[in-house]
């Protein structure tokens, strides 16, 4: 939640978000928002009967919130405004270098809400030029967090607005180089070895 607060303060437009196990608060929050999603607070997988199952971002029907009071009150749940997007954007900050990539998640049914729903090789990835104002805010975010590397997730809404979703200070990035040919590893080597 801290990273969402910082992103909001810096004008990176994170979606409205609440983490709660209070059913009444969840209901009130979701009543005010057109489309709501939920996602894991921690590990994106869960184990049941020895099998690993992914828990990706999922859009909720409002009735699910209204009808599941007991489940919501058992443990904290993240509820977030769902942003209808043109595509996802993975931003890799490596030292002073910023790389951004469009991930065309809207082209497959299994990745519409979360690009992790489809193996990266099946999704179109293209380099993306961020506006200078967004890059400047990302640099301020990195300074505030004391980071020299990050893999950030954004979406570009259908209205043309960039929305910060999360910061992964140890996030994956090599697949982006393998798919697009953009030499991120050169920047990583410069960062590590000068």
Report each predicted region and the residues it spans.
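Generic enzyme active-site microenvironment
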Residues: 37, 151, 164
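C-terminal active-site "lid" helix and adjoining low-complexity regulatory extension at the edge
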Residues: 125-136, 140-147, 156-194
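A short linear hydrophobic-aromatic micro-motif
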Residues: 16, 77-78, 149-152
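Short secondary-structure junctions
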Residues: 10-13, 144-149
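Conserved N-proximal alpha/beta basic substrate-recognition cap immediately N-terminal to
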Residues: 1-14, 25-28
């Amino acid at each position: 939640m801290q990273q969402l607060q910082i992103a909001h303060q810096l004008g990176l437009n994170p979606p409205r978000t609440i983490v709660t196990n209070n059913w009444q608060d969840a209901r009130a929050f979701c009543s005010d928002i057109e489309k709501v999603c939920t996602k894991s607070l921690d590990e994106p997988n869960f184990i049941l009967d020895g099998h690993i199952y992914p828990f990706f971002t999922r859009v909720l029907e409002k009735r699910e919130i209204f009808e599941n009071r007991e489940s919501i009150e058992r443990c904290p749940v993240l509820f977030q405004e769902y942003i209808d997007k043109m595509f996802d954007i993975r931003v890799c900050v490596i030292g002073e270098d910023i790389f951004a990539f469009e991930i065309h998640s809207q082209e497959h049914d299994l990745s519409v809400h979360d690009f992790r729903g489809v193996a990266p090789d099946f999704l179109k990835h293209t380099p993306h030029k961020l506006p200078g104002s967004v890059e400047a805010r990302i640099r301020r975010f990195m300074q505030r967090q004391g980071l020299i590397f990050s893999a950030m997730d954004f979406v570009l809404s259908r209205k043309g607005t960039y929305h910060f979703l999360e910061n992964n200070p140890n996030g994956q990035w090599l697949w982006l180089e393998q798919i697009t040919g953009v030499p991120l590893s050169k920047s990583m080597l410069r960062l590590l070895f000068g």
